[in-house]
Amino acid sequence: MSALMQEMSDRALRLGVPLSVQLDLTYRCNEQCVHCYLDHDDHGEMTTAEIKHLLKEMADAGVFILTLSGGEIFMRKDFFEILECARALTFCIKLKTNAVLIREAQAARLRDLGVESIQVSIYSHRPEVHDAITKVPGSLLRSIKAIRFLKSQGLKVIIANVLMTENMQDYHGVRALADELGTKCTLDPTVTPMMDGNRAILDLNAGESALRRLFRDETFVGNADEFCAPPPAPSGDDMNSLPCSAGHTACYVSPYGEFYPCVQFPLSCGNVRQQRFIDIWRDSKQLKEVRSIRLRDLSSCSQCAHGSTCTRCPGLAFLEGNMRGPSTADCEKSFARTGIPSVNLLAKKEKVSPPRLVQIQIVPTITGSRLSSLGAAASAVA
């Protein structure tokens, strides 16, 4: 994070302002990625008018960075109408897309509208691997062609690569492809549960040995000895630190208007179809609970050697049944990195019972004559 963005984030935190929002315009997609955590059916997306009204409310609340994502954003026929409205409200706009539907005309229009960056999902430099993950033959070549269109318009493109068993051996090739295309490249070695709580796709996560190799690859981590060194003991400042920005300076809104702390944290805090955005942000009891949590409040993590360095995701912890609990995926990454097991992993060796799971159910309701989706009702399943 740049010094300017850090200053903005710190100021937003002090003032209680939602600096950054991810708005998913749709869960519909033209790809069917094996690791996707979304339900691609349409349960009653917000209309163009509803989204424009929401954008105005977010601007009034002080939102600066707006990330438009999905699903596939270009599946919405009103995408550019929404984008024009967002730019008129002076948001800094970032897009997440597979880019398959982008042609020269769309790339030029994105340039004219001043989009800050476009993140494009690429899983391998080899068509047979990428296309097997997306389940769409020819998708890699179409995404690469779109990236060339975007770059020809002078747009900033970031290739995003989720690492899993199917493509773990290909990340060097993806980074070389990014260099050839003149783009940045990010790698994420975490496959997350589906938003309905289904954990079957976690079998796609790379194993410990693959993570160890990744974390010792100095082209990825820099100095491997420093990156993999034992963590320092947590300090008093660490104990008082925030878990992450979710619910503090950032939040997520689904295509159905559900308001969550983060896209990976499906704790419903309200619905913008029934409440003003700012009222949910300020008054939601769920958000207030999220904001109250510090490292010292986490029974396992506050006692863990990794407390000062762990990238624990409270959303993934929530999907395991307790937002104040550990995130096993992050525990496994810390162990692969340092060779030191977390308190959570040590406890799991002594237990037979698995963690509780959380199921998120879409509850359809009729509002007037229009089907809308009320939020994700979370129920803990022992």
Residue ranges and their predicted role:
Residues 28, 32, 36-39, 247, ...:
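Cys/His-rich metal-chelating microdomains
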Residues 20, 24, 28, 239, ...:
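Flanking scaffold residues of small Cys/His-coordinated metal-binding clusters
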Residues 8-12, 234-240, 290:
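Short, P/G- and charge-enriched loop/turn segments at secondary-structure junctions
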Residues 46, 92, 108-113, 121-275:
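Radical SAM enzyme [4Fe-4S]-AdoMet core and its adjacent flexible, acidic
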